[in-house]
């Protein structure tokens, strides 16, 4: 019985992975969507630059 449970779980994981990889094709609403940010770390780097340029009360963390 334990092997059957593991087999069912593995099959479910493989099926869900296949759905995530293939997706649901190009839907009409997707074409009008706002483009995603290709550089998500940009805002974080800007904040760190401001912290580094300003007087920082936490010297060990500000670099």
Swiss-Prot record:
The modification D-tryptophan is found at residue 58. The modification 4-carboxyglutamate is found at residues 53, 55. It comes from Conus marmoreus (Marble cone). Ca(2+) binds at residues 53, 55. It comes from the Eukaryota. This is Glacontryphan-M. One of its GO terms (molecular function) is metal ion binding. GO terms for cellular component: extracellular region. Residues 23-41 have a biased composition (Basic and acidic residues). Residues 1-23 form the signal peptide. Inhibits high (L-type) voltage-activated calcium channels (Cav) in a calcium-dependent manner. Keywords: Amidation, Calcium channel impairing toxin, D-amino acid, Disulfide bond, Gamma-carboxyglutamic acid, Ion channel impairing toxin, Metal-binding, Neurotoxin, Secreted, Signal, Toxin, Voltage-gated calcium channel impairing toxin. Belongs to the O2 superfamily. Contryphan family. Residues 24-51 form a propeptide. Residues 23-48 are annotated as: Disordered. In contrast to the other contryphans, glacontryphan-M is a single homogenous conformer exhibiting no cis to trans isomerization of the Cys-Pro peptidyl bond in aqueous solution. Disulfide bonds join 56-62. Expressed by the venom duct.
């Amino acid at each position: 019985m334990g092997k059957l449970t593991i087999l069912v779980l593995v099959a479910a994981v493989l099926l869900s992975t296949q759905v995530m990889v293939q997706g649901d094709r190009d839907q009409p609403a997707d074409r009008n969507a706002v483009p995603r940010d290709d550089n998500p770390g940009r805002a974080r780097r800007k904040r760190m630059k401001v912290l580094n340029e300003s007087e920082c009360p936490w010297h060990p963390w500000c670099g």
